[in-house]
Structures are given as structure tokens and as C-alpha cells.
């Protein structure tokens, strides 16, 4: 085969050795791994690609040092060529980055230059507006300055006129009054006129000391006059009082003198009738009425009471509500402890930052009630309790009730009871207060309800045992208002070998009839836990529940799933002599033997 024939054949590609292939694959894996780690896309940011490919050739990098050494060791003949390629690659990348930074800077500068004409127009327009405002301000300042100058000029002219008016108008050349022109130049005539004026001055001075008094003296005389008039009024009142007493004693003397002379033969009642006839004959109406009056100081007391009322109204008008409340509480005969005074305080309403005036009034009158040895009436008591509870002052109401400063009534207890039902936190204290009031009023049923709601079941049982007014209907109402299992259990159990206070059967039937099925179910559940002997004793010892009603209870047990209890009750009922079960479809007449 010739050389030409050999050259005409296709050239085969160089065969890559296994080591070269592994080396290239390791470099490719590094590039792929770094690209994925950075998160570059195929069209991703060039900066990140530059960094990755540069690290491939960076022989000073710690992570890629082994790779580049392998390349150099593997192809040591191309070391200078690879180094040159790397430098050229780095220079190319830096040139591209620098070009980008320059383009970004120039682009921003171009935008600024493009906006300069618009900004210039805006600045010029703003300068024109400010110049217009400055002209307006200057014009206003000029006008104000002109007004100030005019006012100064007017003030100067006014001061000049005032000086001219205040100038002395005395004229020395005016002739002397009472003298002619010739006498005014004559020395003797002038001496005589001087002596005349001196005598006149002395006389006027004497007249001032005798005929005139100063204004201070007049004020002193007026005060003395008022004192004398008050003394006169007091003397006149004393005179009238003594005249009245004299007339009264005279009437008594005219009547009793003959009676004493007759050795008191006439009864004293006839003497009193004569005094009354004296009233009709002589017209001594006021005198005779005063004789039979129990309180001789009634007029003085009326004056004192009137003064108290006026003083109270003054305190209200001045806004001194605390002093007014104390004044009303200490008023004589409690004239200010009434509903009209309460309405005055109620009309004031609430004052921000101060206690309620109405509460101050009630607090004052309740605190002084023991001083009068008589509690406040029922109407004011209820209003006071309402006021205290509305202001959330249960502590005050507790103090009033426990210290017996109130008039206890059923309505007062109901108010406190209702407040406790609405406010769960204060319910125990309200129930205790209501119980005190109900006990004082003799309302044992409501007091019993308060005990039960407080959970004092044993005290309630003792209360029922001691009270004779509580009957079965009252107990039914009690368990309706307070459906507690412990209460019903105690009421339906025997105590000291005595029958229970309430029938168990009636209690169960009542619970189911008033939509308290849960309570009735719990009662049946407790009974079903007992043995048949206990159930039989319960049925047979129940004197108030008939056998027909126990059959109703058995039907209720069957309807609610207590089948065993149903069977026990029915077997107990069937075991009774003369008792037979009648079905609903049976038409047998029970009273047939009576009519035939």
C-alpha cells in the first residue's frame, strides 16, 4: 500500500485516554455543581458564570488548587499557554464589568440631564409665586406702618390738647371779688377786707365742727340704728309673748279661782269645759288653744325648722353636697329625711370625679338612724339599697343591714336577692343579707330559699323542722326554685324515725311535669342503685303518693330506660292485697259493685 492510498482514508479522532476522560469529567462536575448551588439558569446572570469559570482556572483558590495542579502536572507543556488564556479571560471579564458600570453611571447622568429643564421650570414658577407673596406682605406692612404713624400723630395731638386744657386758667389781673378797682389799690381797704375774710373763715370752721359730721360718723350711726331696731323688735316680741302668757294665766285664774273657793266640788273635766266656753264667750281663741297645746315651744321649733330648710337649700345651691347630706341627716325631727329631699339629690345626678350626691345623702341618714333610736322608713330604705347597689357599694349595704340601720321589708330583701342573681361574684353575700331581712320580716319561705341557694342544706332542714307554717306546696316551690339533688334527698329522707318532709314520688312527678327532666332522671338513677327492699320501703312509707301515682312513676321509668326499676315498682304494686293492674284497653268499671 502506497503512502497516497493511506492519506486518502478518513482520519480517525484521537483516542482519549481513561485518565483524561476522568479529569475532564471532574472539571465538568465542578462547574455543574457550582452552577446549581448558585442557582443560575441557562440564561442566568453573567457575573455568576464569570466567577464559576474563573475559579476553574484560579490556581490560587483553596478549593480549586488541586484541579489546576492536576492540569499543570498532566499537561506541563501547555502551562504557559493556559496561564495566558486565564489572564486574558480575567481581563476580558473585568473589561465587561467596567463597561457595565460605566453604562449604568452614564444612564443615570443622562436621566438627570433630561429632567433639568422640567426642574428649572418648576423652580422658576415657585420663584414667581414667592415674589408675589413677598409683594403682598410688603404692601400689608406698609399699610400697617401708615396706620401706626397716624395713630401716633393723633395721640400727639390729643396730648397737646389735654395739656392746653389742664393749663392754669387763673388770671392774676382779675379784680378782687367785693372790692372796687380803687379799693383794690388802697392799703387800708385791703386790710379791712382781709380781716373780713379771716372772720368768715373762723365762722365757717366753727360751723363745720357743729353743723356737719364726717361720712364715717354716719356709717357708725347707721349701725347703731340697726342695733337699736333689733333690740326694739326683740322687746316687742317679748312684750307680745308676756302679754299672751298674762292673758292665758288670767283665763286660768278666772276659771280656777271659783273652783278653789267651792272646795273643788266640781270635777276637773267640767272646769276644762268652762275654759273652752271662755274661748267662745270672750274670743280668746289663741289663748285657749295654747293652753291645750302639748308643746308650748311649737312656734320656736317652727322657726328653727324653717332655718334648717333654708340653710339646706343654700348648701345645695352652692354645690356643697356632702355638707348638705350631713345637714339633712341631723335635721330636727327628721324634717329633711323624706322623699322630696331625696329627689333633690337625685336630680343632681353624677359629678365626674366625685361620689354620687344621692349616695352621700343615704350614707348620712343611715349612719345617724341609730342616734334617733328609730330606723329609716321603708321607702327611703329601698331607694337607699337601690342606690348603693347601682353604685356597686355592696359594702355599704352590708353595713346598713348588719347594723340594723334600715327598716326591713320584703321588697328590700327582694332587691338584694335579685342583685345577687345578676352578679354571681356577690351572690353568697347577697343571699346572706336577704336571709337576714327575710328572717326579721318573718318570711320563712324566702329565708329557706336563701339557705338552700347558699348550700346550707342541714340548716334549712332545721329551719323547716322548727317552722310550723311551711307545708308541702311550699316545699314543692322550694325544689322548683332550687332544684338541688342534695336538697331533694334530705327532704325525702326520714329524720330521727320521723316521716320525711316531702314525698319522693311527688317530687319525681313534679320534676318531670315542670321540664326538669335531668333532675328527675338523677333521682331515679339514685333510687335504681338501691336494692329492692329499699325501693319497697320507699314506696310503702310514702303516705302522700297514691299507688296510681306510683304507677305513673313506673311508666316514666320505663320511658326513660330504667326497666329494672320499672319491674321492681310494678312487682311491689302487684304484691299489695286487692291491687290488680288494669290495662288501658280494659273497659271494666271499677265502681260497678257499688251501684249493683
Swiss-Prot record:
Stretches assigned to coiled coil:
129-241
Gene3D superfamilies assigned: 1.25.40.30
- Protein keywords: Coiled coil
The name of this protein is Clathrin heavy chain linker domain-containing protein 1
User: Which organism is this protein's natural source?
Assistant: Mus musculus (Mouse)
Instruction: Specify the taxonomic lineage.
Output: Eukaryota, Metazoa, Chordata, Craniata, Vertebrata
Amino acid at each position: 500500500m502506497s503512502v497516497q492510498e493511506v492519506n486518502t482514508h478518513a482520519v480517525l479522532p484521537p483516542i482519549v485516554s481513561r485518565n483524561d476522560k476522568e479529569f475532564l469529567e471532574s472539571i465538568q462536575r465542578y462547574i455543574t455543581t457550582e452552577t446549581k448551588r448558585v442557582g443560575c439558569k441557562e440564561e442566568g446572570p453573567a457575573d455568576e458564570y464569570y466567577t464559576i469559570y474563573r475559579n476553574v482556572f484560579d490556581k490560587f483558590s483553596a478549593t480549586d488548587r488541586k484541579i489546576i495542579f492536576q492540569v499543570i502536572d498532566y499537561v506541563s507543556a501547555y502551562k504557559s499557554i493556559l496561564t495566558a488564556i486565564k489572564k486574558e479571560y480575567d481581563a476580558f471579564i473585568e473589561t465587561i464589568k467596567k463597561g457595565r458600570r460605566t453604562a449604568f453611571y452614564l444612564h443615570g447622568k443622562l436621566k438627570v440631564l433630561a429632567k433639568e429643564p422640567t426642574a428649572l421650570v418648576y423652580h422658576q414658577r415657585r420663584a414667581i409665586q414667592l415674589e408675589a407673596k413677598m409683594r403682598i406682605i410688603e404692601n400689608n406692612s406698609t399699610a400697617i406702618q401708615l396706620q401706626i404713624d397716624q395713630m401716633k400723630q393723633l395721640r400727639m395731638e390729643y396730648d397737646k390738647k389735654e395739656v392746653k386744657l389742664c393749663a392754669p386758667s387763673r388770671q392774676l389781673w382779675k379784680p378782687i371779688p367785693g372790692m372796687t378797682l380803687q379799693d383794690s389799690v388802697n392799703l387800708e381797704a385791703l386790710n379791712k377786707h382781709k380781716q373780713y375774710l379771716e372772720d368768715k373763715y373762723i365762722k365757717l370752721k366753727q360751723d363745720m365742727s357743729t353743723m356737719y359730721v364726717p361720712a364715717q360718723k354716719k356709717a357708725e350711726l347707721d349701725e347703731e340704728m340697726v342695733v337699736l331696731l333689733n333690740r326694739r323688735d326683740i322687746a316687742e316680741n317679748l312684750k307680745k309673748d308676756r302679754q299672751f302668757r298674762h292673758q292665758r294665766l288670767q283665763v286660768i285664774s278666772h276659771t280656777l279661782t271659783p273652783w278653789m273657793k267651792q272646795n273643788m266640788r266640781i270635777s276637773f273635766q267640767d272646769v276644762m269645759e268652762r275654759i273652752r266656753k271662755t274661748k267662745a264667750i270672750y274670743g280668746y281663741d289663741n289663748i285657749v288653744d295654747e293652753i291645750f297645746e302639748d308643746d308650748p315651744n311649737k312656734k320656736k321649733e317652727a322657726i328653727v325648722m324653717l332655718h334648717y330648710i333654708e340653710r339646706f337649700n343654700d348648701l345645695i345651691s352652692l354645690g356643697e353636697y356632702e355638707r348638705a347630706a350631713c345637714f339633712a341627716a341631723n335635721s330636727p325631727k327628721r324634717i329633711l329625711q323624706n322623699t322630696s329631699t331625696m329627689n333633690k339629690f337625685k336630680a343632681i345626678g353624677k359629678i365626674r370625679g366625685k361620689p354620687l350626691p344621692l349616695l352621700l345623702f343615704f350614707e348620712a341618714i343611715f349612719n345617724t338612724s341609730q342616734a334617733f333610736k328609730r330606723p329609716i322608713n321603708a321607702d327611703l330604705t329601698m331607694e337607699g339599697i337601690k342606690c348603693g347597689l347601682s353604685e356597686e357599694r355592696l359594702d355599704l349595704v352590708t353595713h346598713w343591714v348588719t347594723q340594723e340601720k334600715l327598716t326591713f321589708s320584703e321588697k328590700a330583701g327582694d332587691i338584694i336577692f335579685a342583685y345577687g342573681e345578676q352578679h354571681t361574684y356577690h351572690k353568697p353575700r347577697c343571699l346572706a343579707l336577704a336571709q337576714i331581712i327575710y328572717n326579721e320580716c318573718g318570711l320563712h319561705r324566702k329565708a329557706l330559699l336563701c339557705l338552700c341557694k347558699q348550700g346550707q342544706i342541714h340548716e334549712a332542714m332545721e329551719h323547716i323542722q322548727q317552722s310550723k307554717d311551711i307545708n308541702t306546696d311550699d316545699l314543692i316551690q322550694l325544689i322548683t326554685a332550687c332544684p338541688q339533688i342534695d336538697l331533694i334527698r334530705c327532704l325525702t329522707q326520714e329524720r330521727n324515725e320521723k316521716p320525711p318532709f316531702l314525698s319522693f314520688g311527688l317530687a319525681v312527678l313534679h320534676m318531670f311535669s315542670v321540664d326538669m327532666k335531668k333532675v328527675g332522671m338523677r333521682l331515679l338513677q339514685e333510687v335504681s342503685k338501691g336494692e329492692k327492699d329499699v325501693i319497697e320501703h320507699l314506696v310503702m312509707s310514702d303516705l302522700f303518693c297514691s299507688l296510681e301515682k306510683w304507677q305513673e312513676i313506673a311508666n316514666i321509668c320505663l320511658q326513660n330506660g330504667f326497666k329494672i326499676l320499672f319491674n321492681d315498682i310494678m312487682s311491689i304494686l302487684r304484691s299489695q292485697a286487692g291491687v290488680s293492674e288494669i290495662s288501658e284497653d280494659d273497659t271494666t268499671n271499677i265502681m260497678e259493685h257499688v251501684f249493683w
